[in-house]
Structure formats: C-alpha cells, structure tokens
C-alpha cells in the first residue's frame, strides 16, 4: 500500500522485508 521501498527488483525479487516486486521497483503492501 505504501510507495517505493528504495529498492529495485529488475531481477525479479526484493530483499527488503515487507516489500514486494512491482517491476521495476519494490513496493510495500
């Protein structure tokens, strides 16, 4: 639900807990 996690997920995965990949960036729920 919240905006960008400050992480990109061009490779398809996010390392930051609670973040999911909304290509090409990670977003929080």
From Swiss-Prot:
Annotated crosslink Cyclopeptide (Gly-Asn) location: 1-29
Any one GO BP annotation for this protein: defense response
Source organism, top-level taxon: Eukaryota
Keywords: Disulfide bond, Knottin, Plant defense
Disulphide linkage map: 5-19, 9-21, 14-26
PTM section of the record: This is a cyclic peptide.
Description of its domains: The presence of a 'disulfide through disulfide knot' structurally defines this protein as a knottin.
Summary of the function given for this chain in its UniProt record: Probably participates in a plant defense mechanism.
Family: Belongs to the cyclotide family. Moebius subfamily.
Protein name: Varv peptide D
């Amino acid at each position: 639900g919240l905006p960008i996690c400050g992480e990109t997920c061009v490779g398809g995965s996010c390392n930051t807990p609670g973040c999911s990949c909304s290509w090409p960036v990670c977003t929080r729920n």
